[in-house]
């Protein structure tokens, strides 16, 4: 199985360190310095370039990819990458959502989304009110 992760951030490092060794991993980022300093406990392919370019995605192995995860801080970039992936018959799409108003755009592509604001609020809710069973976040 192969995954392309767009955005060489802390979340990407944490994910790479957590997923099983059965995954072949490519990380794409525009920033060469970020990639140079991006280290994990796994062998990964690092690609410097614009992930909204089909050529860059193909260099990362898009044709043989099982999943694409976008973690950039720019929803426009994330959505464009996911559109290209979907056009190439990749259906395991996931992304961080930076602006809640863009959530429907991700879902319309069939992407699984993570909304950091909701995750943080839910975690702090459990810290403040640990005995509550039902969360107001649902």
Where do the model's predicted regions map?
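Cytosolic regulatory regions of ion transport systems
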Residues: 1-138
